[in-house]
């Protein structure tokens, strides 16, 4: 399946104003009353914890309500629908995206990605084995620099059954584990 990555993470929170200020300070751009985006259009949605438009809360203290993954095309949305509807309800929403829950109860959605292609220079960093790009102790950015996150690149779930979660995402959706936290779970 051609899943590109998370397009949006949706939260239900106790203190909307503080959370909004945090993400603005982080560098996300306010798109509307609820949505805050990175340069490529991916981002987060912040709503009041009891907002009726949100998926049901998990029986934990997590504020995460839904992860919406961007996919390459409608054929991928259709393939995910066909695969996941074998053993669970999958809803098609008004915008053509689909919504369901994973094996641990997290609400997940899939849509044709909203990511915009970026054409930006790489950041000036020195890395082991690479040609030096800037002098030692030179600041890598201007002191007047305002951070602007480029993309929402990943989401981390801390779950009670990492093996079950990994199995769902790998076997049902084709995710590939690239790294692991010892005794915690996969990436």
Per-region residue spans from a language model:
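A broad, low-specificity signal for short, low-complexity segments enriched in glycine/proline
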Residues: 4-10, 23-30, 59-60, 114-118, ...
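Conserved donor-binding loop and adjoining core beta-sheet/short helix segment
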Residues: 30-72, 96-99, 111-113
């Amino acid at each position: 399946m051609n899943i590109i990555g998370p397009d949006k993470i949706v939260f239900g929170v106790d203190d909307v104003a503080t959370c909004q200020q945090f993400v603005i300070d982080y560098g996300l751009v306010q798109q509307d009353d609820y949505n805050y985006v990175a340069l490529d259009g991916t981002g987060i949605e912040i709503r009041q914890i009891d907002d009726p438009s949100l998926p049901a809360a998990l029986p934990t203290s997590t504020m995460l309500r839904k992860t919406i993954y961007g996919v390459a095309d409608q054929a991928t949305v259709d393939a995910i629908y066909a695969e996941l509807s074998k053993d669970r309800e999958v809803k098609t929403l008004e915008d053509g995206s689909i919504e369901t829950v994973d094996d641990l109860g997290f609400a997940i959605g899939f849509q044709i990605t909203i990511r915009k292609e970026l054409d930006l220079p790489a950041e000036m960093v020195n890395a082991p084995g690479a040609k030096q790009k800037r002098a030692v102790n030179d600041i890598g950015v201007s002191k007047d620099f305002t951070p602007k996150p480029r993309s929402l690149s990943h989401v981390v779930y801390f779950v009670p059954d990492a093996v079950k979660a990994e199995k769902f995402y790998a076997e049902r959706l084709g995710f590939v584990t690239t790294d692991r936290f010892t005794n915690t779970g996969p990436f």
